[in-house]
């Protein structure tokens, strides 16, 4: 039906006859001529219909946006004054001699010349996908997956598929469940990750595994999450955490070089503890140079504990942010920031405007001026390295509240004052996470998942002080986004049982949910490690997209619905009866 694609015709094709298929992007009727911008997935080309060729001209009068058409014509060079340097085909045009209208189109519910609301875009996704921005994102995504497969194949990894219908296991988020018709009252689960299967593959002797795989989590959504998502899943035997990180680092560097022509520097590495202390987050955006500065030792006197209304029985922290040249901030803006940190349970936000350092207390304007003396002020200025014209924001509270509040305020101020550097890439590894979290009842749960090995395979700390155990795990962060996470896995059956015991999984539940893994670990399981990288997030970053939906062909809304197909939906009662399922009203 066609000999060329619209976006691929160039000046070298002048006087050549072409056959094109595509859609009407825009129509302009100038009386003697009708100009049509014709579009396919490669781009646009201008087609001319002349009045003197009346038969085809008359047909062209019926054209409307998004009609699907076929055009035969001759490539000709545009006059210099009519050339369009904004498009790749701007030097040429097609003089049409045949027009076939393959299909008409209703008036569009979307306007490609302006922004459309998200619900309309998702409801008419088949039209939204015709836009060049979304189409370009999908092309880039295709190139990224090609590069990944090529890289992994060259590193001798095998692409192996794992089951989609699997067993429900406690992995953190809720499972999507699939009822079994053949086994009444029993359910499959859609995998949150291929975690257990890829470990089984290592036990099977598959030395190097990878897979670009769909995963499913029934969790609350946000701009960088979807209920079904794609991850680059990697597992390898006999490889240290350091070498896994090096492998992934080289893969990420290759993607950034090939897609963005950017040479990423060596990825820095910091511990979880350091990240929380300096940035208030285990996903720090290093494009923002502001760091949290601890001043607890400066305010250790009892009068300060009283002033800040701190409970001495709690794990407290006093810390601040130093904002360079921020003393110009208005009282209203400071009040706005106070309200902002209160969203994260901070009781109050204190501030100090440094007008003139040399004047001591006389040279500052502060909400804590009445408890400061020259010695304390000097220590604060030295610790924060603040200068004239700076502003300090201080919070005194429980450590986790201070970290969260100042961490979020750091990000907000970075954006508000243009401190966070755009068009810059700052990857880093976060390592040495705690092995377990403790809830208010004192119960422990895995920070990552219960198959993560303790650092240095330290059995004694698991036995005597599990709450102090450090895991041999690692997360990859780029510009504040968690791109991936992984760990060295437990390959010793007794240690695996020990971890299950620590997090409160009863023996009967261990056998019911993980019996196949426990049994497999008894047969010479090798040391192994792995990682999972979020493909959707990687594509989102590489395309400069604001939302993960813009890099997925058919995404869900933040309420996990598909507006195009109206799913999830009700099903026929007969189907439910076959599955022995009864609908209960809430």
From Swiss-Prot:
PROSITE patterns: AA_TRNA_LIGASE_II. Homodimer. It is an enzyme of class 6 (ligase). L-aspartate binds at residues 171, 217, 448, 489. GO terms for biological process: aspartyl-tRNA aminoacylation. This is Aspartate--tRNA ligase. ATP binds at residues 217-219, 226, 482, 534-537. Gene3D superfamilies: Bira Bifunctional Protein, Domain 2 (3.30.930.10), GAD-like domain (3.30.1360.30), Nucleic acid-binding proteins (2.40.50.140). InterPro entries: Aa-tRNA-synt_II, aa-tRNA-synth_II, aa-tRNA-synth_II/BPL/LPL, Asp-tRNA-ligase_1, Asp-tRNA-ligase_1_N, Asp/Asn-tRNA-synth_IIb, AspRS_core, GAD-like_sf. It catalyses: tRNA(Asp) + L-aspartate + ATP = L-aspartyl-tRNA(Asp) + AMP + diphosphate. Its main location: cytoplasm. PANTHER family: ASPARTATE--TRNA LIGASE, MITOCHONDRIAL (PTHR22594:SF5), ASPARTYL/LYSYL-TRNA SYNTHETASE (PTHR22594). GO terms for molecular function: aspartate-tRNA ligase activity; ATP binding; nucleic acid binding. GO terms for cellular component: cytoplasm. The lineage of its organism: Bacteria, Pseudomonadati, Pseudomonadota, Gammaproteobacteria, Enterobacterales. Residues 195-198 are annotated as: Aspartate. It is found in: Cytoplasm. Its EC number is 6.1.1.12. Coiled coil: none annotated.
């Amino acid at each position: 039906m066609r000999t060329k694609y619209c976006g691929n015709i160039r000046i070298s094709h002048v006087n050549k006859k072409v056959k094109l298929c595509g859609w009407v992007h825009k129509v302009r009727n100038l009386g003697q001529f009708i100009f049509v911008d014709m579009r396919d997935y490669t781009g646009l080309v201008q087609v001319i219909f002349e009045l003197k060729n009346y038969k085809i001209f008359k047909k062209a009068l019926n054209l409307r946006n998004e009609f699907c058409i076929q055009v035969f014509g001759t490539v000709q060079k545009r006059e210099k004054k009519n050339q369009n340097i904004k498009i790749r085909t701007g030097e040429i045009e097609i003089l049409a001699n045949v027009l076939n209208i393959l299909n008409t189109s209703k008036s569009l519910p979307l306007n490609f010349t302006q922004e459309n609301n998200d619900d309309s875009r998702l409801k008419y996704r088949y039209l939204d996908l015709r836009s060049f921005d979304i189409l370009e994102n999908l092309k880039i995504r295709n190139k990224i997956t090609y590069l990944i497969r090529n890289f992994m194949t060259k590193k001798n990894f095998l692409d192996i598929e794992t089951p989609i219908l699997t067993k429900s296991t406690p992995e953190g988020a809720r499972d999507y469940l699939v009822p079994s018709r053949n086994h009444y009252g029993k359910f499959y689960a859609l995998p949150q990750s291929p975690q257990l299967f890829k470990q089984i593959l290592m036990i099977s002797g598959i030395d190097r595994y990878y897979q670009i795989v769909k995963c499913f989590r029934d969790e609350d959504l946000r701009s960088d999450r979807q209920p079904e998502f794609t991850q680059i899943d990697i597992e390898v035997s006999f490889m240290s955490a350091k070498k896994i990180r090096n492998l992934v680092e080289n893969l990420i560097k290759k993607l950034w070089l090939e897609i963005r022509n950017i040479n990423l520097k060596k990825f820095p590495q910091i511990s979880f503890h350091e990240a929380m202390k300096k940035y208030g987050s285990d996903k720090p955006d290093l494009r923002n140079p502001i760091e949290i500065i601890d001043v607890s030792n400066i305010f250790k006197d009892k009068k300060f504990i009283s002033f800040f209304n701190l409970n001495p029985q709690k794990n407290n922290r006093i810390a601040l942010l130093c904002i360079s040249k921020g003393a110009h901030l208005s009282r209203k803006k400071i009040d706005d920031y106070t309200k902002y940190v209160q969203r994260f349970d901070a009781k109050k936000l204190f501030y100090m405007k440094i007008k003139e350092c040399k004047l001591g207390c006389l040279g500052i304007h502060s909400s804590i001026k009445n408890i400061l003396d020259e010695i304390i002020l000097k220590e604060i200025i030295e610790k924060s390295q603040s200068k004239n014209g700076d502003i300090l924001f201080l919070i005194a509270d429980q450590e986790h509240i201070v970290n969260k509040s100042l961490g979020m305020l750091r990000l907000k101020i970075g954006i508000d004052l243009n401190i966070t550097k755009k068009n810059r890439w700052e990857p880093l590894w976060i390592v040495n996470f705690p092995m377990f979290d403790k809830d208010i009842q004192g119960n422990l749960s895995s920070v990552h998942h219960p198959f993560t090995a303790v650092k240095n395979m330290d059995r004694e700390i698991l036995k005597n002080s599990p709450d102090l155990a450090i895991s041999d795990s690692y997360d990859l962060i780029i510009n504040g986004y968690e791109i991936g996470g992984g760990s060295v896995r437990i390959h010793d059956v007794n240690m695996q049982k020990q971890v299950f015991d620590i997090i409160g999984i009863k023996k009967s539940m261990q056998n019911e949910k993980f019996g196949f893994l426990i049994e497999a670990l008894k047969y010479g399981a090798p040391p192994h490690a792995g990682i999972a990288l979020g493909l959707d997030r990687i594509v989102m970053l590489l395309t400069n997209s604001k939302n993960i939906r813009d890099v997925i062909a058919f995404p869900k809304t933040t309420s996990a619905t598909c507006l195009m197909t109206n799913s999830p939906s009700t099903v026929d009662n007969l189907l439910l009866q076959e599955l022995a399922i009864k609908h209960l009203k809430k």
